[in-house]
């Protein structure tokens, strides 16, 4: 996402970055400078500046985008921004866009803290599309923000368009992460169902690619069957065809499913298959930590013997 931001914001603007992995920051800055030079940018264009912490990023930015693994990480980052008091004033209200997938309650609490202290405007805008979408700039965002001002919504869409292709405004603060958890609940179940169906077909003697082609032309078609097929060799670009490396980690899927189930329980919403799916991902994570979540297929074949 940062690469697309640097490539699409005005050349004279400075992109300020902060990551706990300093090597990643340096590598990104070098790549950004090379890309700027190859596009004919001047000495003061295409700049990337390092910040020591999140507070420094907020102080120097009109728009701050955060992307973090867990709810507690998001809490810690925004607490570090707010605990030192007011930020330097700007002509335009600061935007804080959090693309993390976290629980709706935490997201709403952070939005309330940002808004009541008049620090800026907080937007929950989790992302869908994976590593491939991030690189290609084709990500989808679902965001929650106050609908009182169409000007604000258009400004948010403008920022998200720098990193992705589609942005849905789902409602007030917290709506974005709620929508993302609903989407990933479906994804988690579809991934298991696809893995089970492919394993079933293979054990019946069906050729995997022929089976997948049939499914993807029929009513069983879904993202795990078509794009992220879990059987090695069926989809050349899928993680399964490279030892389940890269892609969307099974630990992240397990985390998102836990968040969805917790939010469902909080709202009194029954989920017939949620608890079973959670147990599957818990076991798969223990046995195949670090792999793409489609490794559920490999786990099933191991159960089959």
Residues of each region from the PLM?
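Hydrophobic beta-strand scaffold residues
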Residues: 50, 121-123, 208, 271
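Beta-loop-alpha module in the N-terminal Rossmann-like domain of NAD(P)-dependent dehydrogenases
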Residues: 52, 63-81, 100-108
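Rossmann-fold dinucleotide-binding core
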Residues: 101-185
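NAD(P)+-binding Rossmann beta1-loop-alpha1 motif at the extreme N-terminus of oxidoreductases
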Residues: 1-63, 67, 87-89, 94-95, ...
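Helical "substrate-binding/catalytic lid" subdomain
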Residues: 175-296, 300-303
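Amphipathic, non-transmembrane alpha-helical secondary structure
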Residues: 3, 26, 55, 59, ...
């Amino acid at each position: 996402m940062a690469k697309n931001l640097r490539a699409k914001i005005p050349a004279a603007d400075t992109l300020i970055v902060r990551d706990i992995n300093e090597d990643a920051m340096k590598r990104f800055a070098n790549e950004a400078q090379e890309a700027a030079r190859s596009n004919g940018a001047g000495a003061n264009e295409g700049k990337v500046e390092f910040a020591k912490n999140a507070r420094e990023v907020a102080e120097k930015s009109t728009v701050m985008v955060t992307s973090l693994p867990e709810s507690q990480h998001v809490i810690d980052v925004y607490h570090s921004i707010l605990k030192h008091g007011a930020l330097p004033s700007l002509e335009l209200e600061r935007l804080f866009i959090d693309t993390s997938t976290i629980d709706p309650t935490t997201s709403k609490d952070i939005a309330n803290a940002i808004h009541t202290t008049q620090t800026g405007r907080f937007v929950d805008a989790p992302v869908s599309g994976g590593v491939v979408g991030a690189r290609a700039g084709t990500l989808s965002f679902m965001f929650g923000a106050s609908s009182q001002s169409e000007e604000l919504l258009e400004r948010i869409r403008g920022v998200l368009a720098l990193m992705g292709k589609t942005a849905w405004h789902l409602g007030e603060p917290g709506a974005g992460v709620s929508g993302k958890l609903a989407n990933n609940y479906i994804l988690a179940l579809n991934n298991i169902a696809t893995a089970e169906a492919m394993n079933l077909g293979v054990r019946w003697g069906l050729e995997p690619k022929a089976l997948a082609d049939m499914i993807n032309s029929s009513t069983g078609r879904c993202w795990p069957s078509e794009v992220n097929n879990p059987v090695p060799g069926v989809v050349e670009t899928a993680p399964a065809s490279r030892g389940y490396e890269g892609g969307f980690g099974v630990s992240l899927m397990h985390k998102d499913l836990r968040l969805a189930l917790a939010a469902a329980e909080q709202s009194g919403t029954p989920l017939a298959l949620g608890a079973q799916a959670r147990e599957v991902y818990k076991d798969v994570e223990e046995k195949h930590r670090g792999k793409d979540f489609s490794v559920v297929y490999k786990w099933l074949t191991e159960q089959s013997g």
